[in-house]
């Protein structure tokens, strides 16, 4: 399988940089996978779990939004937050979700819709992290 260069950058750090076989991205308009030779594209990333495959190794990274750009040079993801899944504190993540739930009643209209959508994404991440932690 052909490889391509992938960089994952957040304001705090370069979370990943190297050659990979595939990257699966939680896109705002649907999840998508990138392989070598992918057509150029710029996409918005929603909160979710990004999966990097390099040979037999798979690495899951929690991203909380950002932008992905595929070019002839490879894939660059500029993430608002990027944390390797094993490094996520599940109790802190659950507390964040609880705070988000408590803030829902004070929102209306589009703000309410966005808050519910973001909460749903966080709950999906939590479910996958809890499922992965059990295996």
UniProtKB/Swiss-Prot annotation:
Membrane topology category: Peripheral membrane protein
Coiled coil regions in record: none
Main location: membrane
Gene Ontology CC annotations of this record: plasma membrane; proton-transporting ATP synthase complex
Keywords: ATP synthesis, Cell inner membrane, Cell membrane, CF(1), Hydrogen ion transport, Ion transport, Membrane, Transport
Subcellular location: Cell inner membrane
Pfam family, one: ATP-synt_DE_N
GO function terms (MF aspect): ATP binding; proton-transporting ATP synthase activity, rotational mechanism
SUPFAM superfamilies (alphabetical): Epsilon subunit of F1F0-ATP synthase N-terminal domain
Superkingdom of origin organism: Bacteria
Disulfide bonds: none
Stated role: Produces ATP from ADP in the presence of a proton gradient across the membrane.
Family membership noted in the UniProt record: Belongs to the ATPase epsilon chain family.
Subunit structure: F-type ATPases have 2 components, CF(1) - the catalytic core - and CF(0) - the membrane proton channel. CF(1) has five subunits: alpha(3), beta(3), gamma(1), delta(1), epsilon(1). CF(0) has three main subunits: a, b and c.
NCBIfam families xref list: ATP_synt_epsi, PRK13448.1
Protein name: ATP synthase epsilon chain
Organism expressing this protein natively: Rhodopseudomonas palustris (strain TIE-1)
Chain's gene name: atpC
């Amino acid at each position: 399988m052909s490889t391509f260069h992938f960089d994952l950058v957040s304001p705090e750090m370069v979370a990943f940089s190297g050659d990979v076989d595939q990257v699966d991205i939680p896109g705002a308009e649907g999840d998508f996978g990138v392989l070598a030779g992918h057509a150029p594209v710029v996409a918005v990333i929603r909160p979710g779990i990004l999966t990097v495959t390099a040979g037999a190794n798979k690495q899951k990274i929690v991203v909380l939004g950002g932008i992905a750009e595929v070019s002839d040079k490879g894939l660059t993801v500029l993430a608002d937050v990027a944390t390797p899944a094993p490094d996520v504190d599940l109790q802190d993540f659950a507390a964040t979700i609880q705070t988000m739930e408590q803030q829902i009643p004070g929102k209306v209209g589009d703000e309410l819709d966005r808050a519910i959508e973001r909460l749903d994404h966080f709950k999906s991440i939590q479910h996958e992290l809890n499922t992965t932690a059990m295996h």
